[in-house]
Amino acid sequence: MDYKKSLNLPDTPFPMRGDLAKREPGWVAEWEETQVYQAIRAASRGRPRFVLHDGPPYANGDIHIGHAVNKILKDIIVKSRNMAGYDAHYVPGWDCHGMPIEIQIEKKYGKHLPVTEVQSKARAYALEQIDRQRKDFKRLGVLGDWHNPYLTMNFSNEADEIRVLGRILEKGYVFRGLKPVNWCFDCGSALAEAEVEYADRVDPAIDVAFPFTDRGALARAFGLDEVDAGAIVIWTTTPWTIPSNQALNVHPEIDYALVRVTPTPVHGPLLLLAQERVEPSLKAWGLEGEIIATAKGEALEGLRFRHPLAAAAQGYDRTSPIYLGDYVTLDTGTGVVHSAPAYGIEDFVSCKAHGLADSDILGPVMGDGKFVDSLPLFGGLSIWDANPRIVEALKLAGSLMLVQKLSHSYMHCWRHKTPVIYRATSQWFAGMDVKPRDGGPSLRESALAGIDATAFYPAWGRARLHAMIANRPDWTLSRQRQWGVPMAFFVHKETGELHPRTVELLEQVAQRVEKGGIEAWQSLDPRELLGDEAELYEKNRDTLDVWFDSGSTHATVLGGKDGVLGGSHGAELAWPADLYLEGSDQHRGWFHSSLLTGCMLYGHPPYKGLLTHGFVVDGQGRKMSKSVGNVIAPQKVSDSLGAEILRLWVASTDYSGELSISDEILKRVVESYRRIRNTLRFLLANVADFDAVGQAVPYGELFEIDRYALAMTAQMQAEVQGHYERYDFHPAVSRLQTFCSEDLGAFYLDILKDRLYTTAAGSAARRSAQTALLDITQTLLKLMAPILSFTAEEAWKVLAGSALAKQADAPRVTIFTEVYHALPPFADGEALTAKWTRLRAIRAEVQRKLEEVRSAGAIGSSLQAEVDLYANAADHDILASLGDDLRFVLIVSRATVHADADDLRIEIAASGHKKCERCWHWRPDVGQDADHPEICGRCVSNLFGAGEPRTRA
């Protein structure tokens, strides 16, 4: 007889190989065809709501690995919340306006298109990009309302954004003023703080002499009767700002020195600089000198010095006063700061505080980076080309003390990677320290309070965002672009004042935009709204900062507080969101702008929690770079290894820091996946012939080890659900992996094989095991589903078609309509866990001894061994309670327990009996049945009799 055929060998259509790259597109198509997302919504209706508001990616270019990380994390959270019993929608969004798309249109069609044509082509381009990105996001297994996303360029969103502008204007936050803002010459526009990045750059660093003018006043400041000719010396890394100099700054508490030097410079023998900087400065200039007098900086206030280019061109024949400034330091330079208020924030603030009118501020640099033609010596030159010319002119004028090359970190445009300057322009601002008209706290105050009330994951994000808000300048709302939501103001042609009915007019414009998009503003004749007043007013041509677009989506999409605005998806979502989740750069981006708009509109943030993930780097910790050749595209990983591997990599990695990825790292993830898949295959195969409705064993009648396995499963489920609740995904993955490999694979399933394969197919022993396995399988699949979505769905379909096929009440469209599995109550769970934890420790010691004996060649497999255990009273009771089932737990052919006062002692010997050809145990009763001499008595009973007596394992 072929006894192998008498075994209950497992079988399942769930294949060992995942073939993920080939099979996953089929699941994506099936989810689309069967409307899985809509099924989830129907199953979740009426539950407590959980809102994750999607930070919109920009609608330009293919998605990269950072996008994949972001969307996978969001998908894990939304799926886990739905399965935890919430109604968690996922409405994806896209950021559609702004410079990058405008640049693409310019590249393709040139720079001279009419505005309306730029806008129509930009809309079409954005839609193309969205379609490409949407396909890639869906390929990652991300479920969402992909057919109805929110787009910042949807007419309703554009209209509501104009309404938001009206509300913050009405509250008193918005004002117009001349201020230095981040300016990109290539963009031809102001930049937001989040659009500026820093990179190393080499610039000329120069020491420049400003000649004395009123020597009598200078002498009095230093307590002298008179002074010779000389100059005060400044240090700067921006020679191009020298033509715009209007003041000098010194620190009131720093000591400044008059130094007589040799050889004598062009402007005279005396130099004025901070006393602490005299020695290094003279050494750098190649001069000798002695200090003849000192004075505190405050004594120098109001003294005037001649412009260093006065000798080179008559247009510079002016003087600059000294103002006091606490920001002056002695780290570098001379302790004297040159001030060009049009090109520096501190310079601007200082000069304005001393009464300089906006109209008197010198701003010769145009928006394209060139000096105005009328500027003496340098008119028409770009500021960068002018730098060496200015240095040469200073030298000819006798005002150049030193020029050196300096490598330093400098502001650059994040799009063009070109240098950015501060440039004073007339812009619209949201005031950080303006008190709103209702008398409430300032924007800065309410934003800082809002940060304190927000949960941060990880916790360090709070201090980072707090520091940014505490130190940031006013928000520059306006941009000088074409593809953006208009700041739809009517401005008086003579006074520059807004129309007195601006808030009302903004609503009228919004109603038009709601029907025709921002193009409606372009085509609007002011007379339609202003009548005869139209002759007095002009349309403001500025557009809103794109960070205002995305930063106001909590109102335009979620509907705002109490749903006042309605919102494009206000019915599905709610304000405030439970969570915003983005990369760490968004502390100064979307998190930041959303906080400010929320606080301006409602006095507090639009979110309850902020989750931050790090950037992706390669295996060596380097940033992804095409030039380095270390870029890993998510599309390539999906097409070769499968998106499931990307999902497992994301979930396995601590996202709070940098996420490392490489081919080697992905290989390790593949191995982890295979082990999980093999566990699932074993589980599915061994419940394939089981009917959950008609064959399940009541909990109280389950074998002891099966009850313990369920107690283990319950503990694991509680831990993993807790990790999901706290957004700690890598510990969740680790716990699932440990459960599969150690709790199941190396322990429970290893022991269970004998009972599953050798007992009668319908026996209580086997059905007890299958009952436990089905609970374990359902628990495991549902816990894995948020992460391993494709695999969990594949396995769920197999389970639904076999063990669960007769359950009438269970929806079978998808695993994602399920909630976490409800395990039976465990009255004895704690006692079981304590007992079996000790049993597992003893078993591990037995396995170690068995391995020693096997290595010595005394036995082949562990089943050839007979074990005697000598144990103290407590251990003896535990071991003896299993009776003959102890041998199945230890996977040996005999296990005998002996009482002993000492600690555990284990003796192992090779069995002298024959091996059963069916169960492979070495037993004394092999051959005692004449009809079946090759098998043991247990197997004879299981095949032809009443079955073996067994209740523990």
Curated annotation (Swiss-Prot):
<dbReference type="InterPro" id="IPR033708">
    <property type="entry name" value="Anticodon_Ile_BEm"/>
</dbReference>
<keyword id="KW-0479">Metal-binding</keyword>
<dbReference type="GO" id="GO:0000049">
    <property type="term" value="F:tRNA binding"/>
</dbReference>
<dbReference type="InterPro" id="IPR009080">
    <property type="entry name" value="tRNAsynth_Ia_anticodon-bd"/>
</dbReference>
<dbReference type="GO" id="GO:0008270">
    <property type="term" value="F:zinc ion binding"/>
</dbReference>
<dbReference type="InterPro" id="IPR010663">
    <property type="entry name" value="Znf_FPG/IleRS"/>
</dbReference>
<dbReference type="GO" id="GO:0006428">
    <property type="term" value="P:isoleucyl-tRNA aminoacylation"/>
</dbReference>
<protein>
    <recommendedName>
        <fullName>Isoleucine--tRNA ligase</fullName>
        <ecNumber>6.1.1.5</ecNumber>
    </recommendedName>
</protein>
<dbReference type="InterPro" id="IPR002301">
    <property type="entry name" value="Ile-tRNA-ligase"/>
</dbReference>
<dbReference type="InterPro" id="IPR023585">
    <property type="entry name" value="Ile-tRNA-ligase_type1"/>
</dbReference>
<dbReference type="InterPro" id="IPR009008">
    <property type="entry name" value="Val/Leu/Ile-tRNA-synth_edit"/>
</dbReference>
<dbReference type="InterPro" id="IPR001412">
    <property type="entry name" value="aa-tRNA-synth_I_CS"/>
</dbReference>
<feature type="binding site">
    <location>
        <position position="916"/>
    </location>
    <ligand>
        <name>Zn(2+)</name>
    </ligand>
</feature>
<comment type="subunit">
    <text>Monomer.</text>
</comment>
<dbReference type="InterPro" id="IPR050081">
    <property type="entry name" value="Ile-tRNA_ligase"/>
</dbReference>
<feature type="binding site">
    <location>
        <position position="626"/>
    </location>
    <ligand>
        <name>ATP</name>
    </ligand>
</feature>
<feature type="short sequence motif" description="'HIGH' region">
    <location>
        <begin position="57"/>
        <end position="67"/>
    </location>
</feature>
<dbReference type="Pfam" id="PF08264">
    <property type="entry name" value="Anticodon_1"/>
</dbReference>
<keyword id="KW-0963">Cytoplasm</keyword>
<dbReference type="Pfam" id="PF06827">
    <property type="entry name" value="zf-FPG_IleRS"/>
</dbReference>
<keyword id="KW-0436">Ligase</keyword>
<dbReference type="GO" id="GO:0002161">
    <property type="term" value="F:aminoacyl-tRNA deacylase activity"/>
</dbReference>
<keyword id="KW-0648">Protein biosynthesis</keyword>
<feature type="short sequence motif" description="'KMSKS' region">
    <location>
        <begin position="623"/>
        <end position="627"/>
    </location>
</feature>
<dbReference type="InterPro" id="IPR014729">
    <property type="entry name" value="Rossmann-like_a/b/a_fold"/>
</dbReference>
<dbReference type="GO" id="GO:0005524">
    <property type="term" value="F:ATP binding"/>
</dbReference>
<dbReference type="GO" id="GO:0005829">
    <property type="term" value="C:cytosol"/>
</dbReference>
<comment type="function">
    <text>Catalyzes the attachment of isoleucine to tRNA(Ile). As IleRS can inadvertently accommodate and process structurally similar amino acids such as valine, to avoid such errors it has two additional distinct tRNA(Ile)-dependent editing activities. One activity is designated as 'pretransfer' editing and involves the hydrolysis of activated Val-AMP. The other activity is designated 'posttransfer' editing and involves deacylation of mischarged Val-tRNA(Ile).</text>
</comment>
<feature type="binding site">
    <location>
        <position position="919"/>
    </location>
    <ligand>
        <name>Zn(2+)</name>
    </ligand>
</feature>
<dbReference type="InterPro" id="IPR002300">
    <property type="entry name" value="aa-tRNA-synth_Ia"/>
</dbReference>
<keyword id="KW-0067">ATP-binding</keyword>
<dbReference type="GO" id="GO:0004822">
    <property type="term" value="F:isoleucine-tRNA ligase activity"/>
</dbReference>
<keyword id="KW-0547">Nucleotide-binding</keyword>
<dbReference type="Pfam" id="PF00133">
    <property type="entry name" value="tRNA-synt_1"/>
</dbReference>
<comment type="similarity">
    <text>Belongs to the class-I aminoacyl-tRNA synthetase family. IleS type 1 subfamily.</text>
</comment>
<feature type="binding site">
    <location>
        <position position="936"/>
    </location>
    <ligand>
        <name>Zn(2+)</name>
    </ligand>
</feature>
<feature type="binding site">
    <location>
        <position position="582"/>
    </location>
    <ligand>
        <name>L-isoleucyl-5'-AMP</name>
    </ligand>
</feature>
<feature type="binding site">
    <location>
        <position position="939"/>
    </location>
    <ligand>
        <name>Zn(2+)</name>
    </ligand>
</feature>
<dbReference type="InterPro" id="IPR013155">
    <property type="entry name" value="M/V/L/I-tRNA-synth_anticd-bd"/>
</dbReference>
<keyword id="KW-0862">Zinc</keyword>
<keyword id="KW-0030">Aminoacyl-tRNA synthetase</keyword>
